């Protein structure tokens, strides 16, 4: 049975109306597209300009560069290589005061020469050498005559030639060998008595000139240079003879940044060449001082004279020193008197020392003046040659013979003379000593 419940008041609770449940509608979330990013086009990267000089591995500007107008660039044109002593570019010029020169030992021993006692040396060494007949002028041949007199007094060279049938370099032409044989016979004739009777003819002279001086046909009977003839003549001799007058040494190349030796290369020359600039600056100095200045000279290589670095291929400023390392028996000096821009001769009055003392690697050699070849004239390509050649020692006198073509005269100086008086060999206002020959004082014959 169903029982209907009633409250005490007998009220009935009305039923609540049902509210329909509406599903909640969430608002749709809109997707916001990203704003497209505008990327500017890529600009090409410009190379950084070389606004400072290009430096070498040693921190010094290289020589093979130039200012292009906007930057420093390398150049392959040697005429544009930097001359740092003259450059107007302050960025490069500021490096010059930082250069460090090497310290060079002087091989000219002035102290020993100043105290040299010739009276003692005379008692222990031979000073009587063979003199020669004078040679006439065979047609613009005074260069030849004076050269022959100088070569004659180089006893051990001449003796090697006279005593040997093969005294030249191997492989020379028959014509050149015949020319040397002609000179050999001339040496023999020059040494025959009477010595005061000059040799007035030498039929082989044209061929000798052609072969020794390497001249093409037809031979021009013009004046030649005495130094060139002597150099050519010595160059084709057997090395045993040539080495008697061959000065050997090294060309030293130093880093300008620290004065350290970079590299060196050997050289060999017949003549010790005195630069024109040194003669210009010291026209009345002694030859001893001139040689000292020459062999202690530290030359800055710049511009077209710079040296290429074998590793970087750049051209670098370097200090350059040229010094002998081996002294020969015969020491030949040539005074460079020619202006390189012309053939004009620079006149000078260099005083010729009777003796020189050189010290190399602890070994000292004393040299005695054997010959002076003098050039007369205002141009080295023209003019006249004479020479003064040592003869012997008599008592307290050294005797020399002055040769002027077929003429010869005996002159003398005191044995204690430090300088050969210039009036013995300078006879004309345009005369200047050109070639000087010294011989090892212990080997004179």
Curated annotation (Swiss-Prot):
- Its recorded name reads Putative ubiquitin carboxyl-terminal hydrolase L293
Q: Record's Gene3D superfamilies?
A: Cysteine proteinases
> A cellular component term (GO) from this record?
virion component
Q: Which residues form the active site?
A: 142 (nucleophile), 384 (proton acceptor)
- Its primary localisation, in coarse terms, equals virion
Q: Which organism is it from?
A: Acanthamoeba polyphaga mimivirus
Query: In which family does this protein belong, per the annotation?
Result: Belongs to the peptidase C19 family.
InterPro entries registered for this protein in UniProt:
Papain-like_cys_pep_sf, Peptidase_C19, Peptidase_C19_UCH, USP_dom
What is the reaction catalyzed?
Thiol-dependent hydrolysis of ester, thioester, amide, peptide and isopeptide bonds formed by the C-terminal Gly of ubiquitin (a 76-residue protein attached to proteins as an intracellular targeting signal)
**Annotated USP domain residues:** 133-441
Q: Name one GO biological process term.
A: proteolysis
């Amino acid at each position: 049975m169903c029982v209907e419940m009633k409250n005490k008041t007998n009220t009935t609770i009305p039923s609540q109306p049902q509210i329909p449940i509406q599903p909640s509608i969430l608002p749709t979330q809109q997707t916001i597209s990203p704003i497209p990013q505008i990327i500017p086009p890529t600009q090409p990267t410009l190379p950084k300009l070389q606004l400072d000089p290009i430096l070498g591995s040693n921190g010094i500007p290289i020589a093979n560069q130039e200012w292009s107008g906007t930057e420093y660039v390398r150049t392959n044109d040697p005429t544009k290589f930097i001359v740092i002593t003259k450059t107007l570019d302050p960025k490069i010029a500021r490096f010059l005061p930082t250069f460090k020169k090497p310290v060079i030992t002087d091989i000219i021993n002035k102290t020993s020469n100043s105290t040299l006692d010739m009276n003692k040396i005379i008692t222990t060494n031979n000073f009587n050498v063979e003199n020669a007949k004078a040679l006439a002028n065979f047609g613009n041949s005074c260069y030849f005559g004076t050269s022959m007199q100088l070569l004659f007094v180089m006893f051990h060279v001449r003796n090697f030639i006279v005593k040997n049938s093969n005294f030249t370099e191997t492989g020379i032409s028959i014509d050149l060998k015949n020319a040397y044989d002609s000179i050999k016979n001339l040496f023999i004739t020059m040494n025959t008595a009477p010595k005061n009777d000059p040799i007035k003819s030498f039929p082989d002279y044209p061929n000798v000139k052609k072969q020794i001086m390497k001249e093409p046909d037809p031979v021009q009977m013009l004046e030649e240079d005495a130094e060139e003839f002597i150099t050519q003549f010595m160059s084709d001799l057997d090395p045993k003879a040539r080495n008697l007058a061959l000065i050997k040494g090294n060309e030293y190349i130093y880093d300008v940044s620290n004065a350290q030796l970079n590299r060196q290369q050997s050289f060999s020359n017949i003549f010790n060449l005195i630069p024109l600039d040194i003669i210009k600056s010291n026209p009345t100095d002694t030859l001893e001082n001139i040689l000292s200045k020459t062999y202690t000279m530290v030359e800055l290589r710049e511009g077209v004279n710079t040296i290429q670095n074998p590793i970087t291929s750049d051209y670098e400023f370097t200090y350059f020193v040229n010094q002998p390392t081996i002294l020969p028996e015969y020491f030949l000096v040539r005074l460079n008197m020619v202006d390189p821009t012309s053939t004009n001769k620079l006149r000078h009055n260099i005083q010729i020392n009777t003796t020189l003392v050189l010290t190399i690697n602890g070994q000292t050699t004393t040299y005695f003046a054997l010959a002076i070849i003098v050039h007369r004239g205002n141009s080295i390509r023209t003019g006249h040659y004479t020479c003064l050649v040592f003869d012997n020692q008599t008592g307290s006198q050294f005797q020399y013979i002055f040769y002027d073509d077929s003429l010869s005269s005996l002159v003398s100086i005191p044995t204690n003379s430090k300088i050969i008086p210039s009036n013995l060999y300078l006879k004309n206002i345009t005369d200047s000593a050109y070639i000087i020959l010294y011989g090892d004082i212990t080997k004179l014959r």
